[in-house]
Every structure is written in C-alpha cells, then in structure tokens.
C-alpha cells in the first residue's frame, strides 16, 4: 500500500497518508493511457471546419477564354483550384471526431494516471484546502512551498474562492474531484489533492 506524506497548505508535513493499492499502486498501462488521451482530445474537437469545393464556389460557369489560339494555357473555369478564389481540392467539411471510450478502459487509464503520479513523486496530499475569500497570495505561497509551477489542484467539491484565487496564476488549474480526467492529471507536473478528494476517488475506483 503506497504511503505518502500528508501536508498542510504551508508545506509542512503533518503525518503520513496511506493510498489504496487498487487505485494508486497499479502497474501503469501506457497503451491504454495513450488511447484514452487520444480519444479525449478528439472529443474536444468542434469539427466545424468547412471550405468550398469548385462545385460550391460561385461563378466560373463560363470558359474564361477559348481553347486554342490565345497562347495561354487552356482553362475551363475560373473556379478551378489553381485559380485565386478557386475551390479547394478535397475541401474539409464538418465532421464528428468523437470517439467512444469503454468504461473499463477509462477505469484502467485513470488508475494508471494516478499511479504514475505516485511513482514519479508528483503527488501532494493536503490535509485540507479552504478559503473564506479569494486570496491569490495564499495559493502562490502554497505553490512555492511545494516548488510547484505547472499544477493541477483538486478539491473534494467545487470551491469558488479557491478557483478565483488560482485562476490568474499561469499554469495552474483548480478542479473538483468529480471533474478530473486522465489528460488533465498527466499534463501537469504537480498533482495537489486534498485527502477528502482522495477518499472520493478511492470510493469510485477501488
């Protein structure tokens, strides 16, 4: 069972915290992680790109000049792709990029992502993280205590004051535990999470 330090927001160690083997101590499956991240990024795409083909561009119904005798290359339409304002060859059209991810694969990927953070010593467990009012200085001070720059902060529930405190800090994102995903966990160098949020994760994935 992985054991990590338990800290307060000032960066002082207040004890040890045991993590579930079933969630934070599994073998990292890089293949599944890759598949899930590719699917997540694909699902974020709008797919609204659109350009006109030569059939859709207005004009160009008349041959621009006669076939022979002008000395110029033969042309059939001013809306052919080689012309300025002509149509696009194989023009992109709106499409759905979404990819379905099986629940079992999501679970394996989430456990692998969390376990990788433990193995790479990139996880920080906080005793608690509260704020009566938005105070960016407090979050900056906490990040400095853990030498954290590109950081994901995870709380048990949505906390407006914590969110407002961190939203102007470059490279820092605050999420409630219900909103975390594999991509967000892996793309940040430091994963700071409250012990109550850890308990929620273990309830779902253990």
Curated annotation (Swiss-Prot):
One of the primary rRNA binding proteins, this protein initially binds near the 5'-end of the 23S rRNA. It is important during the early stages of 50S assembly. It makes multiple contacts with different domains of the 23S rRNA in the assembled 50S subunit and ribosome. InterPro entries: Ribosomal_uL4, Ribosomal_uL4-like, Ribosomal_uL4_dom_sf. GO terms for molecular function: rRNA binding; structural constituent of ribosome. Belongs to the universal ribosomal protein uL4 family. Gene3D superfamilies: 3.40.1370.10. One of its GO terms (biological process) is translation. NCBIfam families: rplD_bact (TIGR03953). The gene is rplD. The keyword Ribonucleoprotein applies. The keyword Ribonucleoprotein applies. Residues 44-76 are annotated as: Disordered. GO terms for cellular component: ribonucleoprotein complex; ribosome. Part of the 50S ribosomal subunit. Keywords: Ribonucleoprotein, Ribosomal protein, RNA-binding, rRNA-binding. It comes from Clostridium tetani (strain Massachusetts / E88). It comes from the Bacteria. This is Large ribosomal subunit protein uL4.
